[in-house]
From Swiss-Prot:
A GO-annotated cellular component: extracellular region
Intrachain disulfide bonds: C3-C16, C11-C28, C18-C33, C27-C39
Keyword Disulfide bond: yes
Subcellular location: Secreted
Modified residues (4-hydroxyproline): P23, P40
Tissues of expression: Expressed by the venom duct.
GO molecular function: ion channel regulator activity; toxin activity
Protein's UniProt name: Mu-conotoxin-like Cal 12.1.2a
Length: 45
């Protein structure tokens, strides 16, 4: 499947990867991070 982004060489499939202290600074989702896109929903290869 298609990767939205890579972090540490791993694939992010949910479109967004965020840190609590930078919720919009390192997000792959074009709409910016929202609660529903927070890290616990991230799926790794």
């Amino acid at each position: 499947d298609v990767c939205d982004s890579l972090v540490d060489g791993r694939c992010i499939h949910n479109g967004c990867f965020c840190e609590r202290d930078a919720p919009n600074g390192n997000c792959c989702d074009t709409d910016g991070c929202t609660a529903r896109w927070w890290c616990p929903g991230t799926k790794w290869d």
